[in-house]
């Protein structure tokens, strides 16, 4: 009799996705981040659910309800910090996952890639709304500043902002709707992740060489299940080290002050994972221009398949492109650093140069390097 996992309608789907899936024999640890992102998402949904049981989405009690979770709820402190730092781990895995895609040319699977970009936007939106919920100073002013950016949209901008706020400023209505959206979005992300996987399994995984691996496949289980479990253990180790030793390392001290609309913090800044985009936003002195640059800094990923001029898919055998890729990584780290600094000399000019460099590398230098490498191969 055929094994039940191959005949049962539900188990068959699981089997074809995680057990008998033919996978390339040479995918490295850079291919672990997909499963790690899945684990992060499950962890965030579970910790978030338990937090939602004790949280109140009201301006008068939101801050004290978070304090209550940390002080009075059984293991509330660990759930809260796992959720807050889990978001950081989520974004670390996301950036690594996208970086892997850029380096090894995974963006040539266009459907998978575009769903991935939508997933990135959805995750960023979710994290932003989640940051508003504790209703500390940085929550309130972060929400005010970021939502206000939409007022740069010509003609409908102001109406749009007031519609999102549910009033004439960030207030009770804003907090309530942000909580509602923050709760529903992870489930939308989970659904999109399923579609992401569906499209990936239409083509099969890429591999470090960028060459077709159809002639050399191995079953996903046990090889990559074991590998993913190791990755998961390392992820949990890193997360719990952060949670138990320095839970506030990546947070902002200002968020331990209750939100006060009458007192603006000296330096308004988002969480660390948004700082690179925030630096690009601030580097343009025009409001609309800044907002466009902010959106384009991530939307530019959609253009990657069209900017690919190389005859090879992966950067594995392309030293010039490799060099430019790591310059891009360094540039993004520079932007992250600048985003957290005050708007003064020399940070302004460094931010502007790093922003120009970012777009120049992706739009001009990397496609040029690929063309040069193509010509070098002719010799």
From Swiss-Prot:
Residues noted as binding heme b b566 in the record, renumbered to the chain: 97, 196
Protein name in UniProt: Cytochrome b
Entry's Gene Ontology BP terms: mitochondrial electron transport, ubiquinol to cytochrome c
Spans through the membrane: 33-53, 77-98, 113-133, 178-198, 226-246, 288-308, 320-340, 347-367
Keywords per UniProt: Electron transport, Heme, Iron, Membrane, Metal-binding, Mitochondrion, Mitochondrion inner membrane, Respiratory chain, Transmembrane, Transmembrane helix, Transport, Ubiquinone
GO-annotated cellular components: mitochondrial inner membrane; respiratory chain complex III
Topology within the bilayer: Multi-pass membrane protein
PANTHER family tied to this protein: CYTOCHROME B (PTHR19271:SF16)
Keyword Metal-binding: yes
Complex formation: The cytochrome bc1 complex contains 11 subunits: 3 respiratory subunits (MT-CYB, CYC1 and UQCRFS1), 2 core proteins (UQCRC1 and UQCRC2) and 6 low-molecular weight proteins (UQCRH/QCR6, UQCRB/QCR7, UQCRQ/QCR8, UQCR10/QCR9, UQCR11/QCR10 and a cleavage product of UQCRFS1). This cytochrome bc1 complex then forms a dimer.
Function as written in the Swiss-Prot or TrEMBL entry: Component of the ubiquinol-cytochrome c reductase complex (complex III or cytochrome b-c1 complex) that is part of the mitochondrial respiratory chain. The b-c1 complex mediates electron transfer from ubiquinol to cytochrome c. Contributes to the generation of a proton gradient across the mitochondrial membrane that is then used for ATP synthesis.
Positions of a ubiquinone binding: 201
InterPro entries, alphabetized: Cyt_b/b6_C, Cyt_b/b6_C_sf, Cyt_b/b6_N, Cytb/b6-like_sf, Cytochrome_b, Cytochrome_b_C_euk/bac, Cytochrome_b_N_euk/bac, Di-haem_cyt_TM
SUPFAM superfamilies linked to this entry: a domain/subunit of cytochrome bc1 complex (Ubiquinol-cytochrome c reductase) (SSF81648), Transmembrane di-heme cytochromes (SSF81342)
Record's miscellaneous remark: Heme 1 (or BL or b562) is low-potential and absorbs at about 562 nm, and heme 2 (or BH or b566) is high-potential and absorbs at about 566 nm.
Cofactor remark: Binds 2 heme b groups non-covalently.
Cell location: Mitochondrion inner membrane
Residue numbers binding heme b b562: 83, 182
Co-factor(s): heme b
GO molecular function: metal ion binding; ubiquinol-cytochrome-c reductase activity
Record family assignment: Belongs to the cytochrome b family.
